[in-house]
Amino acid sequence: MAKTQSPLQWLATTLIRGYQVFISPFLGANKCRFHPTCSTYAIEAIRLHGFAKGSWLAARRILKCHPLHPGGIDPVPPKKHRCNK
């Protein structure tokens, strides 16, 4: 069963997809030094962690994307479940 997105999650992921389809192709192929790309990471983070935390994770990731950072494989961290015992 698919989890429904909040309106903010939907808006953010739609805007990022728009960037991927309409803007990114004109910036050159494979400019991102990370795998997955920063935009794919942002979509995954927002879908998994929600709008607020996912956006924070995406912003941190984008701030790491510069020539002095080596890049590499950087997956979205898994969601931590709270134990209410």
From Swiss-Prot:
**Family recorded in the similarity comment:** Belongs to the UPF0161 family.
Role played: Could be involved in insertion of integral membrane proteins into the membrane.
Stored SMART domains: Haemolytic
Report the record's disulfide bonds.
none
Q: State the InterPro entries in the record.
A: Membr_insert_effic_factor_YidD
Among its keywords, does the record have Cell inner membrane? yes
Q: Record keywords: Protease included?
A: no
> Can you supply one Gene Ontology CC term for this chain's record?
plasma membrane
Q: What is this protein called?
A: Putative membrane protein insertion efficiency factor
Q: Which UniProt keywords apply?
A: Cell inner membrane, Cell membrane, Membrane
What topology does it adopt in the membrane?
Peripheral membrane protein
Tell me where it resides: Cell inner membrane
Entry superkingdom: Bacteria
Q: Name one Pfam family in it.
A: YidD
